[in-house]
Regions:
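Pyridoxal 5′-phosphate
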Residues: 1-253
Length: 253
């Protein structure tokens, strides 16, 4: 039994099938001929599917190589605060001066000048994201716990496909429509001029399939079932292993 999927998750069958089918799409999404338009159509359908899974209808979904690149795109060059519990891809760009209490909760006095993860990969702590938060690492929560970008009230979020059973090397940055972002990779103007380079269509279609499958699992109650399994394991460890500490257990769903 595989106990930890925080680092990466096995490729979902739905993602594998979508990627194999995508190898038959030969056009470049930036081309205006028939093959290019077909590729562009597939790309935009995938974008809509991922937006739906994220509850981000009406927001901009910008494809990147993963959450690390997405974090650099939205956090780089900004004077934002974060906590030491964030992933290194976040702390590399921010001041880690936000306080963390004994339950793993983070205090954010100025949300518009801070970034805060929704879920922690090591402790499982879920944060209450304040309205107007500048950005959030949604990677560990996406596909595992129910949420919708639109009701989180944040300005931007980022995710990676491989955390929920999609392929490695593909992710997305989600921002409120019209948000100004300075491209860090410049060239052909892809992704609305925010991230140049021909889109990884095979990876993107695999990402969309995995995101849709993960959302279907959530709709069928997988999060509640996993919480029951987790609680059962914790009780067994506490009863049979002597003194056991579970950091942040008060802050999990």
């Amino acid at each position: 039994m595989r106990m930890v999927l925080s680092s990466t998750a096995p490729l979902r069958p739905e993602a594998r099938a979508a990627m194999i089918e995508a190898t038959g799409i030969t056009g470049n999404p930036s081309s205006v001929h028939a093959e290019g338009r077909a590729a562009k159509s597939a790309l935009e359908r995938a974008r809509e599917e991922i937006a739906t899974a994220l509850g981000a209808e009406g927001a901009d979904v910008i494809f990147t190589s993963g959450a690390t690149e997405s974090a650099a795109l939205i956090l780089g060059g900004r004077d934002l605060a974060c906590a030491a519990v964030e992933h290194a891809a976040v702390t590399a760009w921010c001041r880690d001066d936000l306080a963390v209490d004994a339950t793993g909760r983070v205090s954010v006095p100025e949300p518009g000048r801070a970034t805060l993860q929704l879920a922690n990969a090591e402790t499982g702590v879920l944060q209450d994201l304040p309205q107007g938060l500048a950005a959030s690492d949604l990677t560990q929560a996406f596909g595992k716990v129910p949420f919708a970008f639109n009701w989180l009230g944040i300005q931007a979020g980022f995710v990676s496909a491989h955390k929920l059973g999609g392929p490695r090397g593909i992710g997305a940055l989600i921002v409120r429509r019209g948000t100004e972002i300075e491209a860090r990779i410049k060239g052909g103007g892809q992704e609305q001029g925010r991230r140049a380079g021909t889109e990884n269509l095979i990876g993107i279609l695999g990402f969309a399939a995995a995101a849709t499958a993960a959302q279907n699992d959530l709709d069928q109650g997988i999060a509640e079932k996993m919480s029951e399994i987790r609680d059962s394991i914790m009780l067994r460890l506490e009863s049979g292993a002597g003194m056991v500490t579970f950091p942040g257990r008060e802050s999990r769903s």
